[in-house]
Amino acid sequence: MSKTHLTEQKFSDFALHPKVVEALEKKGFHNCTPIQALALPLTLAGRDVAGQAQTGTGKTMAFLTSTFHYLLSHPAIADRKVNQPRALIMAPTRELAVQIHADAEPLAQATGLKLGLAYGGDGYDKQLKVLESGVDILIGTTGRLIDYAKQNHINLGAIQVVVLDEADRMYDLGFIKDIRWLFRRMPPANQRLNMLFSATLSYRVRELAFEQMNNAEYIEVEPEQKTGHRIKEELFYPSNEEKMRLLQTLIEEEWPDRAIIFANTKHRCEEIWGHLAADGHRVGLLTGDVAQKKRLRILDEFTRGDLDILVATDVAARGLHIPAVTHVFNYDLPDDCEDYVHRIGRTGRAGASGHSISLACEEYALNLPAIETYIGHSIPVSKYNPDALMTDLPKPLRLTRPRTGNGPRRTGAPRNRRRSG
């Protein structure tokens, strides 16, 4: 298979419903990515699919295309009631559910199928109002879905298509019991089309597929290496005292168009935000305790380009699909090897190149050997001159103003480059 982002296979080559093809082409989707080219022949034949592919490989459009085609090509279950959706798409996080819904909207507009969205945090009555009018495809997180189901606001007895996205993260976040609860209220596996997608097809994910799917076909799209060949990786060994100044110096050197900085704790993220906001960067903060409306606003501002930098924890950033991220900074090396892959996979997406910079400090350097074993290669090491690090830095801000940061728009050139040769 070609290692380029797109294959020679076109959506129009498949026997897809004409309205689906029209909607795809209107949005500029003509050629399939590898995961789409593997999945569509199976789902169009009514086969269940368990797919492994990294983030940014087009798996969302693979299962949305399959879902819309299936519902348009098969009649609804007889005597279906208004509170019975025909398809259910489960996601591990609110943000991912919202983004899947946004990706599905052009297809819904073109086909007339109705979408519903269900996630926790806020919007309970607003989401419920949409559900009460009847939806064909319901996208949501498991907790809110169970809440609606227990109150009979939704009934899963007419489900014809099920999608489980980022199944490995469902396990990591402890949602597997919720998933099984929802599956038990659906028609049997052989009476519906089932799709599962995951960054890793581990034993536990395969076990779930065996339990809840109908003889699923396993498909995998493996890059040359786990971290993707379009991502330039770089590693520094700072002392704890120099770590923050090194980060700020690297940001001045790289001057990223759009960057995500990962840290292992909420407190550390807030500290980074305070330093960067004080230095005039347009920076947003995304941690688990940020209110849902604010989270969505921050993501929207970052996606639009109103913010240049996003500081986030792993939990807060899981499942996010943000285009054109040029740089990822691992301020802390993650404790989980898979989190390293997920983090740097935020850049180098959709055929673009990206740059990942990791800081192996005294506290987290012990995580490095396991990460390098997992990704199958050593991360190239770069050196820096401690005497050249930035020193003229303002006092960091504290979280007494909106976390989205209101630093002035960056203008002009960055400060002088300070990395040693």
UniProtKB/Swiss-Prot annotation:
Chain intervals for the UniProt region annotation (Disordered): 392-421
Helicase ATP-binding domain boundaries: 40-219
SUPFAM superfamilies associated with the record: P-loop containing nucleoside triphosphate hydrolases
Chain ranges for the short sequence motif Q motif as given in the UniProt record: 9-37
Binding residues for ATP: A53, Q54, T55, G56, T57, G58, K59, T60
Low complexity: bias regions: 402-414
Subcellular location: Cytoplasm
Family classification: Belongs to the DEAD box helicase family. RhlB subfamily.
PANTHER family in the record: ATP-DEPENDENT RNA HELICASE RHLB (PTHR47959:SF10), ATP-DEPENDENT RNA HELICASE RHLE-RELATED (PTHR47959)
Known partners and oligomeric status: Component of the RNA degradosome, which is a multiprotein complex involved in RNA processing and mRNA degradation.
Protein name per the record: ATP-dependent RNA helicase RhlB
Source organism: Escherichia fergusonii (strain ATCC 35469 / DSM 13698 / CCUG 18766 / IAM 14443 / JCM 21226 / LMG 7866 / NBRC 102419 / NCTC 12128 / CDC 0568-73)
